[in-house]
């Protein structure tokens, strides 16, 4: 056979294949729509299902469904992290801001949520790339004196956070079950048993998902409760509320700035940084195990995510946390402030507003059920926040000083320290003093925030820390190829990150100066 004849036969085969493909497509369209023109979407789906012909829409549809399925596998940590932003401390600061300035500090609530989402994205990036949480990274890269200093600050933040959970839960128990405050404070230590039974970070994914689902249900109850309360409270025009999300001169007044710093401290919680960087490893490890890249040994402390797993998981993890914070956390915090602004603003009780008084006013001016819904939301917030505070405390102690204390014992110690000031205040001055302790704990958290975020900023901007080495084999030569992948922040994001950190630091320095001068708020 001549060369020319050979190529002619190949050309005929190609033409025949093309004609056959087009005939299949035409036949499919005719079968689908014998009498009238159908939509392109239906045609494309039929071609894909019946003949296996890939079309533009079918490829796009497959890509979307695949992305949604993969995203659903990462749902869970966002709910645990969101709990840190809707704890009883937020009730106190948002209640104070709403009663004094109505809706004008909603801008700070929104800004705080933006900061929280951005800092959480850094935490997830750090935890995913290094395979270690923020505390463990500090132990790996700092000397023990610096590490112990950060550990002490982190423990103070955990205790200050726990104080808010204790007070919120005790107040809710008194409202709902008429349990005395002192007894309610003592009862809060019982949640240690629930955490001991439920939380198994080194266990199977099923046990982790069960715990995440339980906390997610608590978060949903809080959100639904406030949705109902918002529907029953007269908040004025929607324009007035939405105007509060715009910057206002009130933010820069002395009283407004103090409330703003309190909101920042209550929203951008320091212990949430350890949660965000520590919760991602479970899913990364599970994915590497299923792909055959890692075999669990002991407590899995030697685990480091592969580049393939990091590349696949990083975006899903960040999006999952961002959606959780922008939906549940932002909605709940805004709702608390809006309800307080609608009920307390320009009233005689604005200066004495606390968790008890907002319950009384809701019960008197709206309905008894509305007041009880508020108390239910407060109770579930305190419970769920107490659970995740236990997890954060465990990450802190194990990461900074390698203190492998049993979770229940560590929880007993932390909660025992936290309930001491609450017991003293509740026994001495009753409910009037608890609100002051609650507000002070949130300001304390705000002061600690710049110190605990500094290592996070340093690590995520460092090429040395944020690099991953991957090995592959050249198929032709069989040689080992080693590649280094840089996940550190670029110049633009580095500037943004340091700008946020400097902003938070400047606010807290101003607060410290005012407190040192004895300025009253």
Swiss-Prot record:
Q: Where do transmembrane segments lie in this chain?
A: 71-91, 104-124, 152-172, 179-199, 210-230, 233-253, 260-280, 325-345, 373-393, 417-437, 440-460, 495-515
For this UniProt record, the keywords arranged alphabetically read as follows: Endoplasmic reticulum, Manganese, Membrane, Metal-binding, Phosphoprotein, Transmembrane, Transmembrane helix, Transport
The record gives the membrane topology as:
Multi-pass membrane protein
Q: Coiled-coil region(s) at which residues?
A: none
For the modification Phosphothreonine, which residues carry it?
43
Q: Which GO terms describe its molecular function?
A: cadmium ion transmembrane transporter activity; manganese ion transmembrane transporter activity; metal ion binding
Per the UniProt entry, what are the Gene Ontology biological process annotations, in alphabetical order? intracellular manganese ion homeostasis; iron ion transmembrane transport; manganese ion transmembrane transport; manganese ion transport
State its location(s).
Endoplasmic reticulum membrane
Output the Gene Ontology cellular-component terms: endoplasmic reticulum membrane; plasma membrane
List modified residues, type Phosphoserine.
42
Return the similarity comment: Belongs to the NRAMP family.
Its protein name is Manganese transporter pdt1
Taxonomic source organism: Schizosaccharomyces pombe (strain 972 / ATCC 24843)
The primary gene name is: pdt1
